């Protein structure tokens, strides 16, 4: 395919135009008075959202250079969302501010590599200041406040705080769609471990890249599965039952993996395979934990069980299994509660008797997985559009609350960034490196200005006023009053703000140091077969 290529200012100008189109669509959603954006769907009703990453994903531009610019900024939003569950709009606003100011300086003759070094030094200093400002979360109310801001709904904040209170700060919280209206919290026996699907062909929900199995059988094998002949008897038995199959093994490869994938693609049989967690003796112990939780049996030569002789009563069961590329969650295993309690007390005894800190830590992880359970937030809504949007928002709020617990909270509403930006005034920087640091200093005011603009205020005036206020005080855009942000419950997780700043700076540095852009040349639109406007037939009238 032929390529288009642009250099220098023209290349960067195309990228910037694409970035601005995307950022302008996303930034209107920032703050408590942020607006909504309507997303047209190729089928079904349109979606109404104010979630930055959802809006960014929908934007596809015609111009090849603008398209690349928009894709780069999408990466900022997506990466921030993946790490922290929120801050996507803040990251986009920061990236736009840094790129705009940076390109102005590059056009004026600044050295892009010098600017990049200055930006990186300033971001490191501001990130460290944000971490220093962070306050550890101690109360349920603080968790509720953080999650409420992310979800823009106090009820959601309260239910997430309740869920974290029940399963612990490291516990598993999942969000499910419900047929009933409103929100409901349910605690179930469950376990999550850090192994994702072996092949993406197992995915059942392509939008979320998840494989979800309802009421599956669970095959637990302490060896590799490579022969389809060995696996076939158990597959046939499970297929006859009409249930899906979740396979946990040391590895699934070759014709066995191919057989599972082919059946999944054809739609004849739904299954997911993951590698067993842990190594050596620890893997054996974890597989036994899973077997007890699900009411199954570990298929192993050691206990005289071979794969080709497996019957359905040796398989585990669960209400649901959710597998992503990184982890698997078993919800509501069908194991006997007395056996689970016995296993828990056995692990507790092992913890007491262990004299190795490492072993004790791993045993405590197993105990948490087995005894902690899973909190399931069931969400319902009046329409499917609202349900999808609400579910996504709650999932983001859960990740946001976990980020707050992990690294603490800071004043929200763009205030912490503005006040931490003073750390970008680094002594010893000069020339283009100093200019790079000043770009970060100016960009750190952009989120607060945008929140003020969305609330109908003058951004520059608000930023100047907040800069003169005592630390931690800023604008409550919901009622246009200046308050102590933490006391008013306007807080952000430090991890969210830090990730947004670092990801924005990373992409800004890429923009500034780009000297050429190579894009696919759009193919000319072919005329439809047998086309023509039949003008040539005008003279046929005389033949009548």
Curated annotation (Swiss-Prot):
CDD domains, sorted: GroEL
Keyword Cell membrane: no
GO molecular function: ATP binding; ATP-dependent protein folding chaperone; isomerase activity; unfolded protein binding
Residue ranges, annotated region (Disordered): 523-544
Keywords per UniProt: ATP-binding, Chaperone, Cytoplasm, Isomerase, Nucleotide-binding
GO BP, sorted A to Z: protein refolding
Binding-site residues, ATP: 29-32, 86-90, 413, 476-478, 492
Catalytic activity: ATP + H2O + a folded polypeptide = ADP + phosphate + an unfolded polypeptide
Pfam families: Cpn60_TCP1 (PF00118)
EC number: 5.6.1.7
Superkingdom field: Bacteria
Cystine residue pairs: none
Keyword ATP-binding tagged: yes
A single cellular component GO annotation: cytoplasm
Comp. bias (Gly residues): 529-544
Subcellular location: Cytoplasm
PANTHER family according to UniProt: 60 KDA HEAT SHOCK PROTEIN, MITOCHONDRIAL
Known function: Together with its co-chaperonin GroES, plays an essential role in assisting protein folding. The GroEL-GroES system forms a nano-cage that allows encapsulation of the non-native substrate proteins and provides a physical environment optimized to promote and accelerate protein folding.
Assembly description: Forms a cylinder of 14 subunits composed of two heptameric rings stacked back-to-back. Interacts with the co-chaperonin GroES.
NCBIfam families xref list: GroEL, PRK00013.1, PRK12849.1, PRK12850.1, PRK12851.1
Family assignment from sequence similarity: Belongs to the chaperonin (HSP60) family.
UniProt name for this protein: Chaperonin GroEL
């Amino acid at each position: 395919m032929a390529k288009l290529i642009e250099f220098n200012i023209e290349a960067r100008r195309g990228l910037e135009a694409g970035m601005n189109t995307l950022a302008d669509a996303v930034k209107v959603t920032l703050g408590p008075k942020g607006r909504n954006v309507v997303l047209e769907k190729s089928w079904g009703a349109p979606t109404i959202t104010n979630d930055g990453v959802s809006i960014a994903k929908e934007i596809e531009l015609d111009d090849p250079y603008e398209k690349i610019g928009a894709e780069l900024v999408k990466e900022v939003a997506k990466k921030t969302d993946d790490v922290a569950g929120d801050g996507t709009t803040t990251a986009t606003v920061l990236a736009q501010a840094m790129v705009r100011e940076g390109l102005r300086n590059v056009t004026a003759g600044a050295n892009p590599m010098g600017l990049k070094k200055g930006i990186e030094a300033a971001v490191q200093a501001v990130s460290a200041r944000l971490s220093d400002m962070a306050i550890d979360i101690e109360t349920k109310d603080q968790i509720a406040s953080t999650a409420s801001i992310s979800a823009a709904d106090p009820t959601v904040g309260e239910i997430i705080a309740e869920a974290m209170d029940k399963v612990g700060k490291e516990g598993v919280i999942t969000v499910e769609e419900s047929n009933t209206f409103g929100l409901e919290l349910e605690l179930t026996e469950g376990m999550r471990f850090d192994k994702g699907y072996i092949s993406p062909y197992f995915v059942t929900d392509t939008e979320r890249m998840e494989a979800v199995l309802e009421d599956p059988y669970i095959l637990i094998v302490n060896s590799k599965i490579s022969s389809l002949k060995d696996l076939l008897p158990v597959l046939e038995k499970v297929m006859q039952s009409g249930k899906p199959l979740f396979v946990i093994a040391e590895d699934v490869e070759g014709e066995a993996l191919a057989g599972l994938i082919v059946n999944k693609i054809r739609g004849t049989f739904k299954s997911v395979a993951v590698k067993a967690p842990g190594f050596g003796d620890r893997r054996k112990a974890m597989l036994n934990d899973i077997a007890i939780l699900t009411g199954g049996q570990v298929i192993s030569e050691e206990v005289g069980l071979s794969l080709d002789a497996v019957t359905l009563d040796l398989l585990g069961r669960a209400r649901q299994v959710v597998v992503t590329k990184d982890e698997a969650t078993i919800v509501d295993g069908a194991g006997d509660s007395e056996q689970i309690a016995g296993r828990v007390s056995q692990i507790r005894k092992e913890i007491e008797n262990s004299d190795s800190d490492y072993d004790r830590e791993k045993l405590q992880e197993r105990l948490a997985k087995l005894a902690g359970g899973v909190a399931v937030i069931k969400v319902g809504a009046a329409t499917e559009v609202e349900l999808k949007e609400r579910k996504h928002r709650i999932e983001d709020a859960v990740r946001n609350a976990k980020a707050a617990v992990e690294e603490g909270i800071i004043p929200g509403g763009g205030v912490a960034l503005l006040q931490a930006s003073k750390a970008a005034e680094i002594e010893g920087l000069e020339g283009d490196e100093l200019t790079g640091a000043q770009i970060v200093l100016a960009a750190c005011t952009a989120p607060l200005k945008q929140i003020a603009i969305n609330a109908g205020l003058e951004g520059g005036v608000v930023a100047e006023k907040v800069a003169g206020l005592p630390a931690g005080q800023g604008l409550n855009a919901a009622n246009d009053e200046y308050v102590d942000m933490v006391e008013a419950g306007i807080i952000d997780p430090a991890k969210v703000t830090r990730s947004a700043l670092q990801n924005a700076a990373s992409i800004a540095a890429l923009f500034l140091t780009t000297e050429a852009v190579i894009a696919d040349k759009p193919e000319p639109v072919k005329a439809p077969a047998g086309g023509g406007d039949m003008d040539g037939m005008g003279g046929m009238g005389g033949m009548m």
